[in-house]
Amino acid sequence: MSSIAIRLLLIFSCALSSLPAHAAQHVILVVGDSLSAAYGINQDEGWVALLQRRLEKEHPGYSVVNASISGDTTRGGLGRIDTALRTHAPAVVVVELGGNDGLRGLPLKEMRSNLSAIISKSLAFNARVLLVGMRIPPNYGPLYTREFATIFTELAKQFEIACVPFLLDGVALDPQLLQGDGIHPLAVAQPRLLENVWPHLAPLLR
């Protein structure tokens, strides 16, 4: 090998060794509905975008893929989770679905089954899973409302995964933090959503 080739090889090797350790990104896949899709606000104001910026500072080895769709249900999420897992090979999957199932009064047995399947598929892909809990207004009746809320904690216990008790904690009952529909948070509320998620997500970033 010529001396020039050897020098080039050494330079290339040094360049590779000087690359930051976080150059290879680990993906956090967010599979959610309008609450994660920044409905009614700018995309860069949503809690998922805020999460990306926080990761860049605190966990630069991770990046976010936001696969959230406004209006999506657990059935819709189940229908696209396989493709999302194959496409993005996530290290962590954040499942934020179920709110639209509840608001539409869909059968809770089906919702539980769909969420269970999404979690199972994600775990089978060797991803760590964070389940994001939701609640619905009491006008759906005490039985439906109570059973809806317990699905998230019960599934988290069953699969031994992390769970955010309620994404809209501190937001849902404050009209000043909600859009005109009384459901979707304003941009000013998005940092609170991230703070509700972060303590449960951070331990998964290893």
What spans do the regions from the language model cover?
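Catalytic-site microenvironment of enzymes
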Residues: 8-9, 22-28, 60-61, 188-191, ...
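Alpha-helical cap/lid subdomain in secreted, periplasmic
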Residues: 50, 78-206
